[in-house]
Amino acid sequence: MSCLPALDKFLDNYHRSYLSTLGELPRYYPQGEPSLCIQGEFDEASDEAVSWLPVKREHLGSFANVEHALELTLWPDINHFYGEYFAAPVLFDSPWGTGELLQVWNEADFDALQQNIIGHLMMKQKLKQPATWFIGLLDEGDKMLTVDNADGSVWGEIPGELPSAQLAPSLAEFIEALSPRIAPPVKHEELPMPALEHPGIVASFKRMWHNLIGKR
């Protein structure tokens, strides 16, 4: 079962929840990065938060290049989860606590995301662990949310370690268990990691990436 219907519904509920609760769209600090998501005027020199809406991509993002580079077939949901929309990261409440789902802010962000997924998959190969790819974070314990590439199930994973707990048998069922979390935008601190400079790859993931690299 594709995750796309569940993602469509969650993103639609997300901006509707902000409108009904706060009377405004969700806001995000783009840090000078343009996006089709931005509603209203955008000044690249400004450090102010912008209002945004998820936008369906005209040309769907593909991970065929990642599959070719790693000689690996990726679970099809990766193309639906990351390739259908331009959007800011989205916050959620869930049975497993609060967290954040990554999304793609613009085409450059998509390129950076692909490089980070390649890095993650290469690390899994080096550690002789089953392939996973990340979709977000749980706030408690800085734990990644990952998809098992063999069967599409969703797990909690600490970088460098085996996934520790299955959260849902599929990405669709995981997303269906989430509800939008209403919160003010947070301006993420940029860490000196060139491959992770795009704001769509959130600061908390960068901290975990440092931990992962330290275990090489």
UniProtKB/Swiss-Prot annotation:
Stored Gene3D superfamilies:
Syd protein
GO CC terms for this protein? cytoplasmic side of plasma membrane
Its membrane topology: Peripheral membrane protein
Q: According to the lineage, what is the superkingdom?
A: Bacteria
A Pfam family of the record is Syd
Identify the keywords attached in UniProt to this record, alphabetized. Cell inner membrane, Cell membrane, Membrane
Listed InterPro entries: Syd, Syd_sf
Location in or out of the cell: Cell inner membrane
Which NCBIfam families does this one have?
Answer: PRK04968.1
Per the record, the similarity remark reads:
Belongs to the Syd family.
Function statement? Interacts with the SecY protein in vivo. May bind preferentially to an uncomplexed state of SecY, thus functioning either as a chelating agent for excess SecY in the cell or as a regulatory factor that negatively controls the translocase function.
**Full protein name:** Protein Syd
What species was this sequence derived from? Shewanella sp. (strain ANA-3)
